[in-house]
UniProtKB/Swiss-Prot annotation:
InterPro entries per record: Catalase_peroxidase, Haem_peroxidase, Haem_peroxidase_sf, Peroxidases_AS, Peroxidases_heam-ligand_BS
The protein's name in its UniProt record: Catalase-peroxidase
Gene: katG
Segments of this protein annotated with the region Disordered: 1-24
Domain of life: Eukaryota
Entry function: Bifunctional enzyme with both catalase and broad-spectrum peroxidase activity.
UniProt cross-references to NCBIfam families, sorted A to Z: cat_per_HPI, PRK15061.1
UniProt organism field: Aspergillus oryzae (strain ATCC 42149 / RIB 40)
Record Gene3D superfamilies: 1.10.520.10, Peroxidase, domain 2 (1.10.420.10)
Family: Belongs to the peroxidase family. Peroxidase/catalase subfamily.
UniProt xrefs under SUPFAM superfamilies: Heme-dependent peroxidases
Length: 751
């Protein structure tokens, strides 16, 4: 029986360097705090005081662009350029860097250079992009830290377009590299490449390696109605968007259009932008499927040391050039694959299309009764008939896409402008506000998806004004906890993923944020009314043009309330405050895009409950990661907000104190009190009741977002620091520091 052991003859696993059975192997559902410890100075090799913006601005930008332009036609023997031009490859590299972005949590995208790391560097959709980045290395090496990989990959895509005759909309630098894989992103629950059995209720199990998906239409009749799991924006594990062969490999252009519309919308693209991107991008280059994927070796993360980070070694022919295998599809869209023109759209409507197979066995389409006039990438004596992908034909056979495609065909200038704008949005959507943009090619035009905020056009309030305004705020008669809740509600919309949200703009007073359940509209309205009255009184009294924005007042009111709460608890402390925020208008606020930022849960305010899949404490950690908080910062903020009585609905859950409204460490003291016994209250496991162990009398109620700080070993260790007798002062100091951090997360104008 020994020969049937599943581990028989397997090489022993390493027993050093963190190998062996890990905690997550024993307890796979354990709350993971690792995502709160990423991208710190520990993993960053650059000097702590390195200023990337200053380094980028010292770059000879146009010399860099010239070097990139020259690279486009400098074909290398080790990885030859299709048609003698790397443009198509580099467009794909930039697209796939930016195209992982999704709107629900702002994660993904090209803003951190994550394509260099697992899993993205080994996704089936990113085959051969390891070569693209290696082609760029001599240029990255030349310019060093003056340009990040994140910026370089996007800029190279721009230069590729320009080198083939397309006028781009512009380019903004400012993407800082990270130095490790971002483990905060949920890419899906599938365990095989190209699978979608988790993201769809009747999905496809996938395969163990990249290549053509074997279609089985009988098993996938829901492709016209299925719903993609949130927050995902890709139809298969390891793909950027959709399966180019069609849903689950079924060559159905209409069903494919449904997948396209869903995935592109989740990346913030409307139908016109979607058509422009597909038709514009497929004007250039080709796909690669010279033979079966059986010839293709392991992805970079599974390749041997000698491969030096390259993957997908190809045993077919030379393994490169004409023998390249990437997607398994073999399509060159136009007769001029290195020039911008209308050929893609012209062919789309000129020909009738017949289903065929690529040399690798993938579903694709060939023009019926057409002559062979498409050039071969490596043999000038060869010509091919026009071919298309299933997802290309979606632009013709989906009624809405067809209407847009025909308009673009009849109006070339509209097509070019739409593609330029959509490409800029694709490659800059995750950069946040324009204040982060740097470089000489930043477009002057302000775009609605950039969440614009007016520039400061008046003197800001002084220290004397700040002190007077604090007194006015505390004299309004509004419970200070409402000012704290309002400030938190405003600032905590920030997402470190795509740099959206935050207190600047005061969008908390506008639709849709003012109506979010978590913001408790009656309480919010009372706080805002009091602050608006103070704003009107202050501004009308000025004769030198000085103004205070509501955005500044919202944050200042929260700071004043925190200072009062600390003082009431016996601690005199000043909460840092920097004026200069401005108020956005409703016209500057895209309601639909902001609706996607509405929190499902906010454990800092004890809002939301567990789902069948996600316990509430996991939502709390996810929120903390989006706020760029460490585990200690998350801990001290939750404990402080409970003491300050800042639950979204005014409930007593987690308010473990007899003096709510004072900034005390009572939350931790009472949470750690062994005289309290906890049990679930009611039928669910979201609300708990704490009783006195001796008398059985009820003492407290709590949520999972409260009790996790006593249950989770690492969080309990932090809680013990703040719950100790000598932890009171440290608690107040650390709370104020973490509070100030959150209030200023979006202040790219001063940070």
């Amino acid at each position: 029986m020994a020969d049937k052991c599943p581990f028989h003859n397997q090489a022993p696993k390493p027993n050093v360097a963190g190998s062996g059975t890990q905690n997550r192997d024993w307890w796979p559902d354990q709350l993971k705090l690792n995502i709160l410890r990423q991208h710190t100075t520990v993993s960053n090799p650059l000097d702590p005081d390195f200023d990337y913006a200053a380094a980028f601005n010292s770059l000879d930008y146009y010399a860099l662009k010239k070097d990139l332009q020259d690279l486009m036609t400098d074909s290398q023997d080790w990885w030859p350029a299709d048609f003698g031009h790397y443009g198509g490859l580099f467009i794909r590299m930039a697209w796939h860097s930016a195209g992982t972005y999704r709107t629900f949590d702002g994660r993904g995208g090209g803003g951190q250079g994550q394509q260099r790391f697992a899993p993205l560097n080994s996704w089936p959709d990113n085959v051969s992009l390891d070569k693209a980045r290696r082609l760029l290395w001599p240029i990255k090496q030349k310019y060093g830290n003056k340009i990040s990989w994140a910026d370089l990959m996007i800029l190279t895509g721009n230069v590729a377009l320009e080198s083939m005759g397309f006028k781009t909309f512009g380019f903004a630098g400012g993407r800082k590299d990270t130095w490790e894989a971002d483990e905060s992103v949920y890419w899906g629950g599938e365990t095989t490449w190209l699978g979608n059995d988790v993201r769809y209720s009747h999905g496809f199990a996938g395969s163990s390696k990249h290549g053509a998906v074997i279609a089985d239409e009988a098993s996938h009749r829901d492709i016209h109605s299925r719903e993609l799991e949130k927050p995902l924006a890709a139809a298969h594990m390891g793909l950027i968007y959709v399966n180019p062969e069609g849903p689950d490999g079924n060559p159905d252009p209409v069903a494919a259009a449904r997948d396209i519309r869903t995935t592109f919308a989740r990346m913030a693209m409307n139908d016109e932008e979607t058509v422009a991107l597909i038709a514009g991008g497929h004007t250039f280059g080709k796909t690669h499927g010279a033979a079966s994927s059986d010839h293709v070796g392991s992805e970079p993360e599974a390749a041997g040391l000698e491969a030096q980070g390259l993957g997908w070694q190809n045993s077919h022919g030379s393994g490169k050039g004409a023998h390249t295998i990437t997607s398994g599809l073999e399509v060159t869209w136009t007769k001029t694959p290195t020039q911008w023109n209308l050929n893609f759209l012209e062919y789309l409507f000129r020909f009738e299309w017949v289903l065929t197979k690529s040399p690798a066995g993938a579903n694709q389409w060939v023009a019926k009764d057409a002559d062979a006039f498409i050039p071969d990438a490596y043999d000038s004596s060869k010509k091919h008939r026009p071919q298309m992908l299933t997802t290309d034909l979606s632009l013709r056979f989906d009624p809405a896409y067809e209407k847009i495609s025909r308009r673009f065909l009849e109006n070339p200038d509209q097509f070019a402008e739409a593609f330029a704008r959509a490409w800029f949005k694709l490659t800059h959507r995750d950069m946040g506000p324009r204040a982060r943009y740097i470089g000489p090619e930043v477009p002057a035009e302000e775009l609605s998806w950039q969440d614009p905020i007016p520039a400061v056009n008046h003197p800001v309030i002084s220290e004397t004004d700040i002190a007077a305004l604090k007194r006015d705020i505390l004299a309004t008669g509004v419970d200070p906890s409402k000012f704290i809740s309002t400030a938190w509600a405003s600032a905590s919309t920030f997402r470190g993923s795509d740099k959206r949200g935050g207190a600047n703009g005061a969008r908390i007073r506008l639709a849709p944020q003012r109506d979010w359940e978590v913001n408790n509209q009656p309480w919010l309205a009372a706080a805002l009314k009091a602050l608006e009255d103070i704003q009107d009184k202050f501004n009308s009294a000025q004769n030198d043009g000085k103004r205070v924005s509501l955005a500044d007042l919202i944050v200042l009111a929260g700071c004043a309330a925190v200072e009062k709460a600390a003082s009431d608890a016996g601690h005199i402390i000043t909460v840092p405050f920097t004026p200069g925020r401005m108020d956005a208008s409703q016209d500057q606020t895209d309601v639909e895009s902001f609706n996607q930022m509405e929190p499902v849960a906010d454990g800092f305010r004890n809002y939301g409950t567990s789902t069948a899949r996600v316990p509430a404490e996991h939502y709390l950690v996810d929120k903390a990661q989006l706020l760029t908080l460490s585990a200690p910062e998350m801990t001290v903020l939750v404990g402080g907000l409970r003491a300050l009585n800042a639950n979204y609905d005014g409930s007593a859950h987690g308010v473990f104190t007899t003096r709510p409204g004072q900034l005390t460490n009572d939350f931790f003291v009472n949470l750690l009190d062994m005289n309290t016994s906890w049990k679930a209250s009611g039928s669910g496991n979201d609300i708990y009741e704490g009783t006195d162990r001796r008398t059985g009398s009820k003492k407290w109620t709590a949520t999972r977002a409260d009790l996790v700080f006593g249950s989770h070993a690492e969080l309990r260790a932090i809680a013990e620091v703040y719950g100790s007798s000598d932890g009171k002062g440290k608690f107040v100091k650390d709370f104020v520091a973490a509070w100030a951090k959150v209030m200023n997360l979006d202040r790219f104008d001063v940070n």
